Amino acid sequence: MPMDPHPTAFGAFKPLNHVVISFPTAGAMGQALKRIHDAQFEDAQVFQYTPAQMQSQAEYDVAHATSMADLGQDLNLVREQLHLAKLGHSFLVVYAPKASQVETLTQIAMEFGASRAQKYGLLLIEELIPLNESTTQRPESPESGLDPVTR
């Protein structure tokens, strides 16, 4: 079940103190979800999104976000979530305010082949799993989107 209410900053999805994990298949997400529950995360801490649910949410956010959402990478990350949802990726959003919880979720994400995993903090959104072998980065902006290294 998706988060209700839908947490945003300036109209863009921003689940503060949560880890957002995307999986290429619903099966991988289901296996990760079982492991997350085995790691003592409560049902109230875990939210599931089908590709259609994330696509609908991301399309709404892109259409309704304010220009302030473009100051950081929040809106670019929503666009990336939309892209992944259109490719059929499923998502888990897990409340994880403690560093030990984030470490556990990072290991689970890697074990089950997550495509992305990010920790949403107040001022920083942290990439939790390696995304690309390349070390050449380029600036990110609302016009150019996310650095290809982080895709």
Predicted features, each with a name:
Residues 1-151:
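Positively charged, small/polar-rich N-terminal and surface patches that mediate targeting and assembly
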